[in-house]
């Protein structure tokens, strides 16, 4: 098996790492950065940009630039309606599920995420110099079963075998603790990212990493902090100028970028100026937005969001059956954990300064790479056992609309449990197994993650049939459910994946489309390179003709001019095959002319540097080295 890469698929940014040379290495992307914006831009002619190039064009292309797609993964439209309405791009409701509408083409959240994963895959392949097919992908600890399944589907669409889905705080703890030897520690991982918040309590020592509890909120993160600044700016501008910027997608995209920048700056300074010239116009008169935001104002605006981090921390400590004094270290993960008020909240609750020993943007990917090395049994990683938990209670709906629990929250996974149920009415020959996830007592108050029917039950009085329901949750936190009638032996199984909305056939179709798009992207890049090569060759040839026209043999000049025109025509038509042929033709006639020029007249030898190095021929040997030198390097880059 080749390398298993670790990918932190984040709401705002993503990161990829690999275990190499007995240590995890964070891989820089093609732009030279160690994290990649989780942004996909769709530009003219179906071309796609991912990462920084997509983010750079977002202001001028807001309706076709997708960000924060992670917030829609594995969710129904109703569950993500608030986020959908806040986005400048169009999110529609298709059969109860969110879809991103880009000029009539409807993309699932998994497809958009797969485009980001393809970028991370390519980044790793460029670094390793070999194809990558296997990955460990991280998810928020509080992700539901359907959100985990959707993440796995995104990996499959991107052409990756997802070897393991790992909780982000667990990955961070693994990265933090892997070099701590046999030291026994209890740590809290406080992970406040771009779109989600997790808190996990772990104990490790002797190579065993055990998650004691986890809690969180999948709708709390840096995006929400951005939104309070955006609302403050938009409301202020409306009050001052009477113009509603929320109706203008381009203006909202500018506000989004300005809010994010201001939030980041306020982590290191006490005030920042937000200056957005020409944000709007009225009666042909341009309007500018200039505001100063202090850290105190920002903390007041974000007070409720900051306080919302506290209850999950309290619940996690309670579920772990510990007190805050039992915690040896608090690890901060996620870009939003840099907010000073958040750090103050963590310090006050846990009674200790949080550790600054890890990079909050990279530590999750590093942990995922270590998990990949563990699965791959690579040398240098040591004997490590990782015991994670399921974040939410799993159960089924029973008579009266009650949720009956089978697997409690914070149960170590993998885990399997069976319970026996019976029928509710006489002569009932079928039962519906409705699978739920959540902590509320009634079925309707929890998240439905799938259902199936068990038919062919032997008719009998109510309460007589014995239906054995088995929940089997794997190491990825993904659930398999089966129901069996003990009398007839009839059995029905389901792998909980329906709530993601994608069938195996749809995943395969999307995977094929992703591969086609990758090939198309490669072809487009090669086309651009070829056009640039032709453009450079045209420019160089024209300059050479201008400077050396009187030295070129008369019988050769028409051939050069004809070949040059052929290349110009091919370049104008953007025909790659024609450009190749024209370049070869131009090289050929230039070499013939060069050979005659070198023969000279009356025994004189022209300078050898007047040749066309790299254009298909070799530099001529010998010749004068006089002062009257004309350089015309003619390169064909392949």
Curated annotation (Swiss-Prot):
An example Gene Ontology molecular-function term: ATP-dependent protein folding chaperone
Sequence positions bearing Phosphothreonine: 196
Alphabetical list of Gene3D superfamilies matching this protein: 1.20.1270.10, 3.30.420.40, Actin, Chain A, domain 4, Substrate Binding Domain Of DNAk, Chain A, domain 1
Record's keyword terms, sorted: ATP-binding, Chaperone, Nucleotide-binding, Phosphoprotein, Stress response
UniProt induction comment: By stress conditions e.g. heat shock.
Top-rank taxon: Bacteria
Family of the protein in this entry: Belongs to the heat shock protein 70 family.
Function: Acts as a chaperone.
Name of this chain's protein: Chaperone protein DnaK
Gene source species: Hoylesella loescheii
Designated gene of the protein: dnaK
């Amino acid at each position: 098996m080749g390398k298993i890469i670790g990918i932190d698929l984040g709401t705002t940014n993503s990161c990829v790492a690999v275990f190499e040379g007995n240590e995890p290495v964070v891989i820089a992307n093609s732009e030279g950065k160690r994290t990649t914006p989780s942004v996909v831009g769709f530009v003219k002619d179906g071309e796609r940009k991912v990462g920084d190039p997509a983010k750079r064009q977002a202001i001028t292309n807001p309706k076709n630039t997708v960000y924060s797609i992670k917030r829609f993964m594995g969710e129904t439209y109703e569950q993500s309606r608030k986020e959908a309405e806040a986005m400048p791009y169009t999110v529609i409701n298709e059969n109860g599920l969110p879809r991103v509408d880009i000029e009539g083409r409807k993309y699932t959240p998994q497809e958009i995420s797969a485009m980001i994963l393809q970028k991370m895959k390519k980044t790793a392949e460029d670094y390793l110099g070999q194809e990558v097919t296997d990955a460990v992908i991280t998810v928020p600890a509080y992700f539901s079963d359907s959100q985990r399944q959707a993440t796995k589907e995104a990996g499959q669409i991107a052409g990756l075998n997802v070897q393991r889905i790992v909780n982000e705080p667990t990955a961070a703890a693994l990265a933090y603790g892997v070099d701590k030897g046999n030291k026994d520690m209890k740590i809290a991982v406080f992970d406040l990212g771009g779109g989600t918040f997790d808190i996990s309590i772990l104990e490790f020592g002797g190579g065993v990493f055990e998650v004691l509890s986890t809690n969180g909120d999948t709708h709390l993160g840096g995006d929400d902090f951005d939104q309070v600044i955006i609302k403050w700016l938009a409301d202020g501008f409306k009050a001052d100028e009477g113009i509603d910027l929320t109706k203008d997608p381009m203006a909202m995209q500018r506000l989004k970028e300005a809010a994010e920048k201001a939030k980041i700056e306020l982590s290191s300074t006490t005030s920042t100026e937000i200056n957005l010239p020409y944000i709007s116009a009225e009666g042909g008169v341009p309007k500018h937005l200039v505001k100063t935001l202090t850290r105190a104002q920002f903390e007041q605006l974000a007070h409720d969001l900051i306080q919302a981090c506290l209850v999950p921390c309290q619940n996690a400590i309670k579920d772990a059956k510990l007190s805050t004094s039992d915690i040896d270290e608090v690890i901060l993960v996620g870009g939003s954990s840099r907010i000073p008020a958040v750090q103050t909240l963590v310090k006050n609750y846990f009674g200790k300064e949080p550790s600054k020993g890890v990079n909050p943007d990279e530590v999750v990917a590093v942990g995922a790479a270590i998990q990949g090395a563990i699965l791959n049994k690579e040398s240098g990683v040591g004997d490590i056992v990782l015991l994670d938990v399921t974040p939410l209670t799993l159960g089924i709906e029973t008579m009266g609309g009650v949720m009956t629990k089978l697997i409690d929250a914070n149960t170590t996974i993998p885990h399997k449990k069976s319970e026996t149920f019976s029928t509710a009415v006489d002569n009932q020959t079928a039962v519906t197994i409705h699978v739920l996830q959540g902590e509320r007592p009634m079925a309707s108050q929890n998240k439905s993650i799938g259902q199936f029917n068990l038919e062919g039950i032997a008719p009998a009085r109510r309460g007589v049939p014995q239906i054995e329901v088995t929940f089997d949750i794997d190491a990825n936190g993904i659930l398999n459910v089966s129901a069996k009638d003990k009398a007839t032996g009839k059995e029905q199984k389901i792998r909980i994946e329906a709530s993601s909305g994608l069938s195996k056939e749809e995943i395969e179709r999307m995977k094929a489309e992703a591969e086609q798009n990758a090939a198309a992207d490669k072809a487009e890049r090669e086309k651009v390179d070829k056009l640039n090569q032709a453009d450079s060759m045209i420019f160089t040839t024209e300059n050479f003709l201008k400077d050396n026209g009187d030295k070129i043999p008369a019988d050769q000049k028409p051939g050069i001019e004809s070949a040059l025109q052929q290349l110009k025509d091919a370049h104008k038509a953007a025909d790659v095959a024609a450009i190749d042929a024209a370049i070869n033709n131009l090289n050929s006639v230039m070499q013939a002319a060069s050979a005659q020029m070198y023969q000279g007249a009356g025994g004189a030898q022209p300078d050898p540097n007047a040749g066309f190095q790299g254009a298909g021929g070799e530099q001529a040997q010998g010749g004068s080295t006089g002062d009257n030198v004309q350089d015309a390097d003619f390169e064909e880059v392949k």
